[in-house]
Every structure is written in structure tokens, then in C-alpha cells.
Amino acid sequence: MAAVIRIRAMAAGTRLRVLNCGLGTTIRSLCSQPVSVNERIENKRHAALLGGGQRRIDAQHKRGKLTARERISLLLDPGSFLESDMFVEHRCADFGMAAEKNKFPGDSVVTGRGRINGRLVYVFSQDFTVFGGSLSGAHAQKICKIMDQAITVGAPVIGLNDSGGARIQEGVESLAGYADIFLRNVTASGVIPQISLIMGPCAGGAVYSPALTDFTFMVKDTSYLFITGPEFVKSVTNEDVTQEQLGGAKTHTTVSGVAHRAFDNDVDALCNLREFLNFLPLSNQDPASIRECHDPSDRLVPELDTVVPLESSKAYNMLDIIHAVIDEREFFEIMPNYAKNIVIGFARMNGRTVGIVGNQPNVASGCLDINSSVKGARFVRFCDAFSIPLITFVDVPGFLPGTAQEYGGIIRHGAKLLYAFAEATVPKITVITRKAYGGAYDVMSSKHLLGDTNYAWPTAEIAVMGAKGAVEIIFKGHEDVEAAQAEYVEKFANPFPAAVRGFVDDIIQPSSTRARICCDLEVLASKKVHRPWRKHANVPL
């Protein structure tokens, strides 16, 4: 019996040693595997950080441009960037694209989230060092993913565009990727702020995403936006045109109105973008942040009492009024070099973000025309979508006459600005500084378009038209034209006819304008408006 027990014990010991031997081999195998995976992870990360390689990075720098990652690093708060999809690679196997040398971790775009002055934003930065920043299916997928996340959590999306366009090797998949992005641009419109910063070429299908975003900024001399390049234009129309002439920053900020501002270089653009974001809310559900204000809300501005010339035909600069009224003269003007007869931009009043709209008497006497109407309308609609109060300074003699305007559709385009002000439900405060003539008076956030508070300065002239034109109609053939003009001015070219009818709420001293506006904004902060249900409005596009 004892012998049997010893034999069984020996057998059990043998089996145990065998099991231990097998387990040891397994453990050693498992221990060595993570080392291999970790090495691969680190290698992939290193490759992703290099983008298209040092040679292409150097070429990017020689052009005066930062790399995709350098741009993100400068834009966001230090250490706040959390990258997503670093290991994503393109899926194209045609034209030799499956070769290992044509695979780059992250493909041609860097995506993720971070913070600007402590506030959450999502960002994508196209990497020109990888296939010229061209858009592949994987590239589009990465952008769409962060856009979906931004909509879900309610945070702005910033696109740093530097791309040669669609990746030709991927064919229709690349085009599908563009459409996926366009759809999200439309879905996000009015929900979260969308900002495009063009920092290199942006051609073909790539241009439509920036066009769908709320604001488009460009970098001088290095960024271009066009549907087709100069070579194609030459082949079709026989026009000789350079990239800069066709789609450079100057063209789009002064002629086409496609871009809202242009900056000197990448660093200047990114620093200004950080400043700009401070004015905006994170989403349509989030009020714009209120900054601590050291500029007294009841501050009087004596120089405003003499800023408007006594002669109604003499020009002055509306920016002088705007700068004097807002907090600490800090005004971020939008489209300053396009349609200069109207001024738009963001400022603060007692720490609150406001949208400013003002006619500019220095340019075309402040008349409204096609371009200024479109410029103003889009800005007003953005402010309304994101609950930013509107302050309007009015000095408008009417709509610009002439065949060029009529043939160009001034009636339809002018209606856009009228529509935008009428549709807006945010607090609306209007100050008539001098002329408010004809239909343009109605359009510029008048009481009839449900302006909340409408003020007139003593210099205000609210009438159907100017005295000279009115007299030629009313007193046609009258012997004493000067006396007739004086009579018209006495009766109509002053603020009293509108004031006695309640079309302006008060005639105020210009020096008290800041104090009155700040007080009104405090009261109107709780404004609520309920409109009839509709699927969407039919804007006169």
C-alpha cells in the first residue's frame, strides 16, 4: 500500500513539474508580448508626430508655415490637447498606396479636443506634409468624429485648413468624405460656432466646408481659396491669373466677401483666433461668458456730444462712436475691408458680449447696397442664433441707387438684412445718430421690427427722404426753394415726428449712450420671445 502511495506521489510530482514548465513558458510568452506591443505603439506615435517626415516639415517651414501640430500647440492652452485617432491610416490599396512607405499614422489630419482660455473646443488641423493634406476617407472620418462629439457636448469646432483637395487615388470615397463633412457643417449650424482658418491651399470640394462655417479667416500670402486653380481657369477661359489674384486673402477679404479677416502669418492668425473665441458662447445653449469689467457701466462720454457734424452732408467715422461706447475700446471688427459702408463686429458692454452693427458715413455716405446688406444680414443671424444682443448705430440716407444695384438684385439682397433684424429675438437696441431715411430706416432694426429700445440723438433726422429731394417733389415749382427746405427740415428732419409717435423711446444726449445701453442690457437679459411653430423660414436668398 505504501509503495502504491509513493508511486502516485511521484507521478503527481512529475505532472506538477510538467504543468509548471508549461505555465512558465506561457508566462514568459505573455511577458514578452506587451513589450512588443508597447514598442509598436511608441513607434507609431513617433511616426505620427513626424507626419510626412523631417524633410517635408523643413519644406513647410521654408514656406513660412507652421506644421499641423505646431498650429494646434499654439492655438490651445498648453498641455490641454487630447488627440484622437492617432493610429488611423488610409484604406486605399490602389496605385501603390498599400505600400508601407505610403502609410502614415493619423493620415493627413490631426484631430482632437483641447481648451482655449480654459474653455472646451474641438479642432482639426490638416497636415500638408502628408500627401499635401489631401482628404481621404479616413481623413474625413476623423473630422466627422470630432464634429459629432462637438455637437453632442456643445463646443465649438475649429478647422485649420491646409489641403490640396481630394485624394485622387481614392476617387469617389474622397468625394463621399467631403459630403459627410458638409452634412455635419449644416447640422451644426446655429448649434455650435464653427470657425475655419485657411492656412494654405484650399481648392475644389475643400472650399465648401469653410463656406458653410460661421467665420472664415485667412493668412496673407500663404492661403488660397478657389474652386479651380489658375491653370484650369487658363485652359477654359484663357484668363491669365495668379493664385493670389484668383483666391488669395486680399481677394476674399476685399472683393468676394468669402473670408472675414486676413492675418499676417500663422502666429498672428492663431493668436487672433484665441482672442476671437473669447467673444463667443460654446453653443446655442450656453451664454457667452461675462468678463469682469473695469470700465464703469455708467461712464459718460462727453466727446460724443460733438462727434456728429452740424452739416448733415458732412461725413464722420462711426468707429469713433463705437469705440467710445464699448468696454475699454476693445472691438473685434468682422470683414473690415469688405462693404465698408457698414461696420459689424463683436464688443462687450459691462462685460457682456454684444454684436455691433453700424452704418459708416465715411463710405458712400453710409448707404446700404447689395454687399453691405448681405454682410450685415449674415452677422445679425449669427448673433441671433447664439443669443448675442444686437446694438445698432444708424446713419443711413437710404439704399444706393443705380442700374448696377437694381440689376444685381438690391431688392432681394436688401430684404435679407430686413429679414434678419425682423427675425432676431435677442435684445435689440438701436441708436439713431443722424440720418434715418426711407426704407433703410425701417431695415436698420427699427421699432417696427420689434426693436426693444430705440433711441435718437438730437441730431437725428428721421424722414422719408432728405430735405432737398422732398422739396423738389412737395414744392415743385415753388418760388422760394430755401424757405421750403427750411419748412421741411423744421417739420420732418428731426427726431420729434418719430418720438411723438413712439417710434423712438427717447431722445438722449449722446454722452449718456453707454450708460443707457448698459442699463437696458441688464433689464433685457431675461427677454423671452415665442414665435409660431414652423419647420424653417424661407429667407430671400
UniProtKB/Swiss-Prot annotation:
One of its GO terms (cellular component) is mitochondrial matrix. Disulfide bonds: none annotated. Residues 34-535 are annotated as: Carboxyltransferase. Its main location: mitochondrion. Residues 296-535 form the CoA carboxyltransferase C-terminal domain. The modification Phosphoserine is found at S73. GO terms for molecular function: ATP binding; propionyl-CoA carboxylase activity. The modification N6-succinyllysine is found at K101, K250, K476, K491. PROSITE patterns: COA_CT_CTER, COA_CT_NTER. Residues 1-28 form a transit peptide. The modification N6-acetyllysine is found at K101, K476, K491. It is an enzyme of class 6 (ligase). Keywords: Acetylation, ATP-binding, Ligase, Mitochondrion, Nucleotide-binding, Phosphoprotein, Transit peptide. It catalyses: propanoyl-CoA + hydrogencarbonate + ATP = (S)-methylmalonyl-CoA + ADP + phosphate + H(+); butanoyl-CoA + hydrogencarbonate + ATP = (2S)-ethylmalonyl-CoA + ADP + phosphate + H(+). The keyword Nucleotide-binding applies. One of its GO terms (biological process) is fatty acid catabolic process. It is found in: Mitochondrion matrix. Residues 34-292 form the CoA carboxyltransferase N-terminal domain. Its EC number is 6.4.1.3. This is one of the 2 subunits of the biotin-dependent propionyl-CoA carboxylase (PCC), a mitochondrial enzyme involved in the catabolism of odd chain fatty acids, branched-chain amino acids isoleucine, threonine, methionine, and valine and other metabolites. Propionyl-CoA carboxylase catalyzes the carboxylation of propionyl-CoA/propanoyl-CoA to D-methylmalonyl-CoA/(S)-methylmalonyl-CoA. Belongs to the AccD/PCCB family. The holoenzyme is a dodecamer composed of 6 PCCA/alpha subunits and 6 PCCB/beta subunits. PANTHER family: PROPIONYL-COA CARBOXYLASE BETA CHAIN, PROPIONYL-COA CARBOXYLASE BETA CHAIN, MITOCHONDRIAL. The beta subunit contains the carboxyl transferase (CT) domain. This is Propionyl-CoA carboxylase beta chain, mitochondrial. It comes from Rattus norvegicus.
